[in-house]
Amino acid sequence: MTSKAVVFAYHDIGCTGIEALLNAGYEIAAVFTHADDPRENTFYASVARLCAERGIALHAPEDVNHPLWLERIRQLRPDFLFSFYYRRLLGAELLACAARGAYNLHGSLLPRYRGRAPANWVLVNGETQTGVTLHRMVERADAGPILAQQAVAIDPEDTALSLHGKLRKAAGALLRDSLPLLALGVLPEVEQDESQASHFGRRTAADGLLDWHRPARQLYDLVRAVTQPYPGAFCQVGEQKLIVWSAEVVAGNHGREPGSVLSCDPLRIACGEDSLVLRFGQRGERGLYLAGTQLATELGLVEGARLRGPASGPQRRTRVLILGVNGFIGNHLSERLLRDGRYEVHGMDIGSDAIERLKADPHFHFVEGDIGIHSEWLEYHVKKCDVILPLVAIATPIEYTRNPLRVFELDFEENLRIVRYCVKYGKRVVFPSTSEVYGMCQDPDFDEDRSNLVVGPINKQRWIYSVSKQLLDRVIWAYGQQGLRFTLFRPFNWMGPRLDRLESARIGSSRAITQLILHLVEGTPIRLVDGGAQKRCFTDVDDGIEALARIIDNRDGRCDGQIVNIGNPDNEASIRQLGEELLRQFEAHPLRAQFPPFAGFREVESRSFYGDGYQDVAHRKPSIENARRLLDWQPAIELRETIGKTLDFFLHEALREREAQA
């Protein structure tokens, strides 16, 4: 019986995959591809042309995961989906359309070099082997079980173009051997070894900058990784750009400074280790392709001259405005940015106890104040700074029912004013959305771009925080369509030192773990709301802040206009389990003897704890594919470690409180 396939394909290997399917006897019901980008050098074969010649139905939608396209694909009733160098991620609903599974051909030996541009990256990194992999598609990019692989040797003289040719041949051979077995259902699958996984993002022309302080071998690898048809490696000669198309490594650098011209015939440049002969290149984007010797003459180079790589002079630090700088995220983020050395942090908050350790840093500027009052200071600093983070918010569940109007006024109205200042002055805003916006969504994993945002009835006032944040997300998105640069990030239950204060927990206005620790410290029963069965995914603040710092860094602008969940799906636990692990570590803590005996667990109804208008959520687990793809980020800290350092912080705080009262 003929197997029916729907194919997602682009590039040479897209054509190779389509030809292989036809040769293996598959029926191709439709092909989805991309319209060629006029800004891109399309040196590869055309999937559109091939399909036209073969009489195959072809589509190029902007969003293949759109419900309209999902329904059309379902109506085709495919046995298989195949992706051959298609450039967009296929969502879970789309993958489920295939009765016998969805499969991707990836241009590396997975699990190494997941992600974008693997053929370029293996050359940049000096690898001697790569290959192609046929694997089952899962929601995580390039992470599904492997069905077949074929290795490809990388020769010292290979360029990205020659290596791509080798990969194309390997792909053809692998598919020729594998597709018939797949149709018969006899091709075994092997899970990927996550400990060996590596992930690489897309490359841009700016990544071709030559840093002469690096070893010549590394620069040679960069040149061959980005030479024609790619934009090329480059450096500066005075005010002129020199693009290098071909080079070779020569031993020694005569002890000269990196970037020094050692000779003009051949054109040889000293590197941090050894030297590089520039064989061919061109002046600027529109120059002629010339030999290195002629380039030296036309550029006016002489022995001893210096070529420039990355700017070596002092650069202005990026100014980051953090409103709510004394809060949990604000103080940890400030510390991380100041440690980086590339940022100047300006902050405002109504207190400063959590940032006292930062005040001595000359690049940290703090003003004590209220964003609702100090509007002139606020507008001036939005205008002055480069990146704006409005972190001021009421984010404790009991306040959602106790002070709903205050939640709306601060979390929506005051922050909307800040967003409008960003629009007015053309500033980038990194806005803290929340995992609460997903509400009672029933998806197993909450996806930023696909999950529905579901909240309860109007009389359940606990949702005022969720909808205030969601509405502001939508306003920011709408401003983004008019040119506002933004990123929305959604923290999932971040924990760590300085999360709250025990004093806040005493009045009920704190996060769950702080409330639990307060009960241990004071010897009162740990209250489990509705039995504590609710599950959350807890994220260590150090993991979360690292992701947020990468959003602020925004390499290649990849975070612009994006929504990013920041959470740890592997750290899922119920509130009861959280309490039990806290108790275990509390009993083993060196300070245990300083506190009263454990008073037990007590189950309470949510209404008695939070008051009328509360409604809870059974689970809240993030999809972190956007964070992996955009930030090359993966949370690493286990829950028990996070609980341990959070507990330790609050136990020491409790003793300090006791000493102060003595």
From Swiss-Prot:
Region (Formyltransferase ArnAFT): 1-307
Active-site feature positions: H106, E436, R620
Record-level Gene Ontology MF annotations: carboxy-lyase activity; UDP-4-amino-4-deoxy-L-arabinose formyltransferase activity; UDP-glucuronate dehydrogenase activity
Biological pathway: Nucleotide-sugar biosynthesis; UDP-4-deoxy-4-formamido-beta-L-arabinose biosynthesis; UDP-4-deoxy-4-formamido-beta-L-arabinose from UDP-alpha-D-glucuronate: step 1/3; Nucleotide-sugar biosynthesis; UDP-4-deoxy-4-formamido-beta-L-arabinose biosynthesis; UDP-4-deoxy-4-formamido-beta-L-arabinose from UDP-alpha-D-glucuronate: step 3/3; Bacterial outer membrane biogenesis; lipopolysaccharide biosynthesis
Residues noted as binding UDP-alpha-D-glucuronate in the record, renumbered to the chain: 395, 400, 434-435, 462, 493, 527-536, 614
GO biological process assignments: lipid A biosynthetic process; lipopolysaccharide biosynthetic process; response to antibiotic
Family designation: In the N-terminal section; belongs to the Fmt family. UDP-L-Ara4N formyltransferase subfamily. In the C-terminal section; belongs to the NAD(P)-dependent epimerase/dehydratase family. UDP-glucuronic acid decarboxylase subfamily.
Annotated InterPro entries: Arna-like_SDR_e, Bifun_polymyxin_resist_ArnA, Epimerase_deHydtase, Formyl_trans_C, Formyl_transf_N, Formyl_transf_N_sf, Formyl_transferase-like_C_sf, Lipid_A_modif_metabolic_enz
NCBIfam families: PRK06988.1, PRK08125.1, PRK11908.1
Region annotation (Dehydrogenase ArnADH) ranges: 316-662
Organism: Pseudomonas paraeruginosa (strain DSM 24068 / PA7)
The name this protein goes by in its record: Bifunctional polymyxin resistance protein ArnA
Annotated Gene Ontology cellular component terms: membrane
Superkingdom as given in the UniProt entry: Bacteria
Function: Bifunctional enzyme that catalyzes the oxidative decarboxylation of UDP-glucuronic acid (UDP-GlcUA) to UDP-4-keto-arabinose (UDP-Ara4O) and the addition of a formyl group to UDP-4-amino-4-deoxy-L-arabinose (UDP-L-Ara4N) to form UDP-L-4-formamido-arabinose (UDP-L-Ara4FN). The modified arabinose is attached to lipid A and is required for resistance to polymyxin and cationic antimicrobial peptides.
Keywords: Antibiotic resistance, Lipid A biosynthesis, Lipid biosynthesis, Lipid metabolism, Lipopolysaccharide biosynthesis, Multifunctional enzyme, NAD, Oxidoreductase, Transferase
Site for Raises pKa of active site His, residues: D142
Annotated residues for binding of (6R)-10-formyltetrahydrofolate: R116, V138, E139, R140, A141, D142
UniProt-annotated site: Transition state stabilizer, residues: N104
